[in-house]
């Protein structure tokens, strides 16, 4: 077993005792850091940054040099999987990600390959191995993927969407085609995450960014069902240590009980869910991650500290809390505000652990 100097993040996910509440930030390697912007400029574009193991490692480590974070998260993108399926990912200025060959019908789904994670996605595994080597056991490394439903929204819509009318048209008019796509994605994501674990990821997270746009019935059928399949197929032990799994559905606070039934170790919460209520409902089964509004980082440090104190008190005494934002950090947040946030979590949380 590789020695970890700081394992409180992994311990908290497994609801084991810790000295202080661990903290990391979604998108902690990102555009709010001037050093990230410099490295991205060096890479040329976003996907070139993802595909260069040394540069992906560099941006993964940048926030850890600034802040005493309790975990590193692989620098990559959820759309690596559809890109490896041959959809032709590109980034349009001001538009976000686009695909040259979106999925429009069952015939398109039938043609999609299931990517070999050590081949078409080998650059991700190289990044995982490089980051693990450079972390030198300081903190654990989180691997991740998008959920099948969330990946499918981009693949069917052809990119980002506000109303999701194209994928919902497929969902209601041709559900068989969508189920075939989601099944293929579930298989691909399972292989992809297991390859990340074998390459050195010590915990994995499934980001279901767009599950919250569904009705409860559709969420169960088209999103949660496929995340459950992935959880069932994941390696849960590696290098002599349990590999915790976190599910995060943005806008999914009403479905926590169903999510906790999947066998995952932890649930991510966005900022619209009350953490005290979430703990009452599912804290006996899973750890909770979250859940400060990312926009709170625009506030003065004293106000950030008050919010941290409120969320810590909401979760209360005992184990099973990983502090995070309720979604990714915004790109124009002052870096010193992120520092005040991390420092406040550690300083104010010790009283809740004894």
UniProtKB/Swiss-Prot annotation:
Q: Where is this site: Transition state stabilizer?
A: 77
This enzyme catalyses: uroporphyrinogen III + 4 H(+) = coproporphyrinogen III + 4 CO2
Q: Which GO terms describe its biological process?
A: protoporphyrinogen IX biosynthetic process from glutamate
Offer a single GO CC term for the protein. Answer: cytosol
Q: Which PROSITE patterns match?
A: UROD_1, UROD_2
Q: What is the protein's name according to its record?
A: Uroporphyrinogen decarboxylase
Q: What job does the chain carry out? A: Catalyzes the decarboxylation of four acetate groups of uroporphyrinogen-III to yield coproporphyrinogen-III.
Instruction: Please give the organism.
Output: Salmonella newport (strain SL254)
Biological or metabolic pathway of the protein: Porphyrin-containing compound metabolism; protoporphyrin-IX biosynthesis; coproporphyrinogen-III from 5-aminolevulinate: step 4/4
Family per similarity comment: Belongs to the uroporphyrinogen decarboxylase family.
User: Which residues are recorded as binding substrate?
Assistant: 27-31, 77, 154, 209, 327
Q: Give the UniProt subcellular location, in the record's own words.
A: Cytoplasm
Report the principal subcellular site.
cytoplasm
Q: Which UniProt keywords apply?
A: Cytoplasm, Decarboxylase, Lyase, Porphyrin biosynthesis
Q: What class of enzyme is it?
A: lyase
What is the superkingdom listed in this entry's lineage?
Bacteria
């Amino acid at each position: 077993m590789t020695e970890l100097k700081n394992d409180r993040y992994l311990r908290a996910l497994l609801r084991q005792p810790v000295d202080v509440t661990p903290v990391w930030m979604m998108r902690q390697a990102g555009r709010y850091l001037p050093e990230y912007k410099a490295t991205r400029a060096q890479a040329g574009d976003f996907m070139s940054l993802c595909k260069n193991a040394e540069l992906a490692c560099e941006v993964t480590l940048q926030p850890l040099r600034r802040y005493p974070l309790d975990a590193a998260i692989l620098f990559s993108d959820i759309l690596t999987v559809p890109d490896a399926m041959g959809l032709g990912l590109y980034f349009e200025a001001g538009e976000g990600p686009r695909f040259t060959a979106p999925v429009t019908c069952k015939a398109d789904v039938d043609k999609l390959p299931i990517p070999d994670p050590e081949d078409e996605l080998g650059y991700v595994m190289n990044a995982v191995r490089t980051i693990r080597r450079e972390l030198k056991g300081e903190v654990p490394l989180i691997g991740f993927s998008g959920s099948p439903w969330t990946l499918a929204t981009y693949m069917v819509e052809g990119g980002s969407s506000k109303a999701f009318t194209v994928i919902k048209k497929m969902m209601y008019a041709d559900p068989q085609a969508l189920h075939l796509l989601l099944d293929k994605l579930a298989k691909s994501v399972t292989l992809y995450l297991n390859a990340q674990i074998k390459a050195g990821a010590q915990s994995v997270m499934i980001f279901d960014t767009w599950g919250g746009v569904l009705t409860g019935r559709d969420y169960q059928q088209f999103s949660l069902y496929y995340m459950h399949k992935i959880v069932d197929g994941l390696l849960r032990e590696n290098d002599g240590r349990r590999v915790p799994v976190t599910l995060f559905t943005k806008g999914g606070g009403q479905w926590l009980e169903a999510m906790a039934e999947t066998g995952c170790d932890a649930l991510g919460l966005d900022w619209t869910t009350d953490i005290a209520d979430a703990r009452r409902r599912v804290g006996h089964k899973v750890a909770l991650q979250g859940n400060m509004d990312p926009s709170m980082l625009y506030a003065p440090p004293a106000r950030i500290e008050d919010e941290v104190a409120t969320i810590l008190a909401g979760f209360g005494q005992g184990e099973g809390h990983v502090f995070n934002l309720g979604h990714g950090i915004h790109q124009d947040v002052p870096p010193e505000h992120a520092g005040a946030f991390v420092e406040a979590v550690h300083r104010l949380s010790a009283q809740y652990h004894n």
